[in-house]
Amino acid sequence: MSDPHFAAYSFVDRITEFHAGKRARGAFAIPPHVAAFPPALVAEAVGQLAAWVAMDAIDFRGRPVAALATETRFEGDAKPGDTLELAVDIEQCDDEAVAYDGHASVGGRRVIELADCLGPMLPVADFDSPDALRERLSLLRAEGAPAGRFAGVGDIAVNVNRLTPGSGLHATIDVPSAAPFFADHFPRRPVFPATLLLDLMMRRALDVARGSPALGESARAVRVTHVKMRSFIVPSQRLDVEIALGAVDDGVAKAMLSAKTGERLVASARLELMAEA
């Protein structure tokens, strides 16, 4: 990849409808050559569209960061070669924070829905060039960006130290010291993406759930709530991950996901899983 900026972790190719400070519609063509495009990255695409509306609304003085998503519903899968149809509606936006709802579809079929998301604003110049972002938004709203530049994020090892099928696990994640996505997220201040961490934790939660006799191999994630990022995760940081799966009630099990550095909690979420019908 010649230049990972706006490529290695950017999931909006075109903005087809834009109402300043209010709403937007856009698209992202998932490259057919990537191995997969998991639900957490679909949620990232929706959040990035909201970020474009938010940054434009305050003249690129700030940018929202992933901090709190009250509810995300997983309604279907997006596959390599699919085109995501993205939509966001802004409830409130100022220099302090943006609040929004959004969803993504494939071929008119809803695959994800985000409700009551809140992203606090931080100075945009700490993370990226305001001028480069303005130019990028103009491109997205005009002819769109070249598709197919996303090459995947590569393998990030999750080292499982303890696994109790159907109950829980403990694992460690060593955040890479360098990776192409750091040049995109973000050029001036590399941050490990919250949605990438969520994807890694969701995958391990599925490993636990598939060991439950009540869920089995067909277990799938249907909803995540109370996603909270408490601090940035930086290159070379070690994360201790805990997954705790509760009892199955009416066909649904709830898992608590958390990541710590030392004794400090940096991320948490609640994941609901059920057996595929």
Range-by-range predicted roles:
Residues 1-36, 61, 75-78, 91-97, ...:
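Non-catalytic linker/capping segments at the edges of enzyme domains
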